[in-house]
Design a protein with these regions (language model features):
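Residues lining hydrophobic/aromatic ligand-binding pockets adjacent to catalytic sites
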Residues: 2-228
Length: 228
């Protein structure tokens, strides 16, 4: 994937601004994504650890569980670790590599099967989701997340795909579209109405979980919730 990003037309229609990439991002992120004709997924931003860039939140019988994709240390961090100081060169999101140490893919898939196996639509979407936890086709986190985003939109809002499937998969470098476009985390977008959740009796309603929660619980009606 090119490091220069995609340079869109000078005045793309209804550009919503910039969003950071997410791993099965929160519901509010997808609601915001669907609120404009197009968004810029910022691949040139400094990578921020411990965010939805590499983790998602799902519901379990015990409450919220975080699933984290491990990433490799940057060369700067490795040099700093060897020499006893912190790396000074910022790691850009487009350069973050997925770590294949451990069995995190299997652990994530097993967690999803346990959490949503009894949900109305998990079995219906399982074949679409499973490849992201079995295949190792993606070395870069940004590529992995973009493939996930495309699949989520294909399942939830296929009519939105043409805008996001254009050149370079909609990846833009910060500052290359419209001046003063806001940079958004994709969180905190308005109030969130409740919907039925698998463990609502035990936990009450858990807001703004991963898009996977909405997909498994509401299926084809997920788009109605996101558009509401």
């Amino acid at each position: 994937m090119g490091s220069q990003g995609y340079l869109p037309d000078p005045q793309p229609p209804n550009l919503g601004g910039y969003l950071h990439t997410t791993y099965f991002g929160p519901i509010s992120w997808y609601r915001q994504l669907l609120s404009a004709d197009s968004w810029a997924i910022d691949e040139g931003e400094p990578y921020v650890k411990q965010t939805t860039r590499n983790h998602c939140l799902i519901a379990t019988v015990s409450g919220v569980q975080k699933l984290t994709v491990p990433v490799e240390k940057s060369r700067s961090e490795e040099r700093g670790a060897r020499n006893g100081f912190s790396g000074s060169e910022p790691l850009l999101t487009r350069d973050v590599r997925i770590s294949e140490h451990g069995k995190w893919r299997t652990e994530h898939w097993n967690a999803l099967c346990t959490a949503y196996g009894e949900s109305p639509f998990f079995d219906y979407y399982a074949d679409d989701l499973r490849p992201f936890f079995e295949r190792r086709d993606w070395e870069l986190l940004i590529d992995y997340n973009m493939a996930i985003m495309q699949k989520m939109l294909e399942l939830i809002a296929p009519s939105h795909l043409p805008q996001l499937g254009e050149a370079a998969n909609g990846l833009f470098s910060c500052g290359r579209t419209i001046k003063n476009a806001p940079l958004s985390s994709g969180r905190g977008v308005g109030g969130e109405a409740s919907y039925w959740q698998v463990y609502q009796r035990q936990n009450g309603f858990l807001p703004d979980l991963s898009i996977l929660d909405l997909l498994c619980c509401m299926g084809p009606e997920a788009i109605l919730y996101l558009r509401n």
